[in-house]
Amino acid sequence: MFPDLAADLKAAMPDLRGRLLGNEPLAPLTWFRVGGPAQVLFTPADEDDLGYFLSLLPAEVPVLCIGVGSNLIVRDGGLPGVVIRLAPRGFGEARSDGETVHAGAAALDKRVAETAAAAQLGGLEFYFGIPGTIGGALRMNAGANGRETRDVLIDATAVDRAGRRHVIDLAGMQFSYRSSGADPSLIFTSARFRGTPASPDAIRAKMNEVQAHRELAQPIREKTGGSTFKNPPGHSAWKLIDAAGCRGLRIGGAQVSEMHCNFLINIGDATAADIETLGETVRERVKAQSGIELQWEIKRIGVTAGIAG
C-alpha cells in the first residue's frame, strides 16, 4: 500500500469531473493480469478535465499514462504517483472525414482500421492486427505487416504536464522503429490519419489476411503482452530466441510461448517478477548464443515487490 495521495488531490481539485482512486489494482487493467496497485489512478472525463488535473498536480508527483495494457508489465510493487488511464467514453472517438480518419487516444487500433474501411479508405489495415490503442501506437510507432504509424499519421494532439494543449506534426513526432522521440511527458489525446481511397473488397481482404495471420501464428487467447522484444536490424527476434533454445522455457508461472517464441505468457499464476525474469533470461541466452542483445519492446513500469509502502 502507498500513502494516501488521492484524498489530497481531490481536495485540491474541486472541479474535477473524472474518477480518482487511491491504491487501485492495475493487474486487471493489463493483458498479463499481473502487478501491484497505482498510488493514484485517474480516469479523466475528457481532454479539458485532463488539462485541469495536470495544471493543478504538483510537479514532483510522477505521472504515467496507460491504455488497455496490451504492451505492459506492471511490477509487483505497483506504481508510485499517478497513473492516468484514458477511457473510451472521453477519448474513444473514431470517425472519418473525407480521406482523414480522426481517432481518440483510447480508440482501439482495430476500431480505427474498421472506421477507415467503412469509409473505403485503405492504408490503415495494419492496425486491424495490433491489440492496443492509438495513444500507445503514437508513443511507440506501432506497426505490423510492413506498415507503421508514421506511414499514415497527419498529426497528434497532446496535453503537457502544465495542462496545455499541443498539436504535433509528423516531423515533431520524431518516429523511429517502435519509438517516438516526442517529449515523454506529453499525454496524447487524439490523432489524425490519412487514408487512401480503395475498394472495399481489397481493404477487407487485407484485414482478413492480418487477422488470419494472428490466429495462426500468435497466442492471442493467452494472457500475454504481444511481441516482447524488438526485431534487431536484419534479424527476427523469434528466430534468435528459438535458436537459443528458449521456446517453451518456463520460470514460475511465466512461459515462452510454444506457438510464437517472441511472446511471453502467464500460464495462470505468474507474478510480474516471473515474467520479467523470464524475459531477462531469454535475453542472456540469446546474447550468449548469437552475440545479439535483444531490446525490450514491452514496457516495464513500477517498483518490485517490497519497495512500495
From Swiss-Prot:
A single Gene Ontology CC term: cytosol
Keyword Glycoprotein: no
Localisation per UniProt entry: Cytoplasm
Cofactor(s) listed in the protein's UniProt record: FAD
GO MF term set: FAD binding; UDP-N-acetylmuramate dehydrogenase activity
Enzyme class, UniProt record, top EC level: oxidoreductase
InterPro entries on file: FAD-bd_PCMH, FAD-bd_PCMH-like_sf, FAD-bd_PCMH_sub1, FAD-bd_PCMH_sub2, MurB, MurB_C, MurB_C_sf, Oxid_FAD_bind_N
Catalytic residues of the enzyme: R178, S227, E297
EC number annotated for this UniProt entry: 1.3.1.98
Entry keywords, A to Z: Cell cycle, Cell division, Cell shape, Cell wall biogenesis/degradation, Cytoplasm, FAD, Flavoprotein, NADP, Oxidoreductase, Peptidoglycan synthesis
Pathway(s) where this gene product acts: Cell wall biogenesis; peptidoglycan biosynthesis
BP-aspect Gene Ontology terms: cell division; cell wall organization; peptidoglycan biosynthetic process; regulation of cell shape
SS bond list: none
Record field: catalytic activity: UDP-N-acetyl-alpha-D-muramate + NADP(+) = UDP-N-acetyl-3-O-(1-carboxyvinyl)-alpha-D-glucosamine + NADPH + H(+)
Domain of life: Bacteria
Record-annotated FAD-binding PCMH-type domain positions: 33-198
Chain's role: Cell wall formation.
Family: Belongs to the MurB family.
Protein's recorded name: UDP-N-acetylenolpyruvoylglucosamine reductase
Source organism: Rhodopseudomonas palustris (strain HaA2)
Gene that encodes the chain: murB
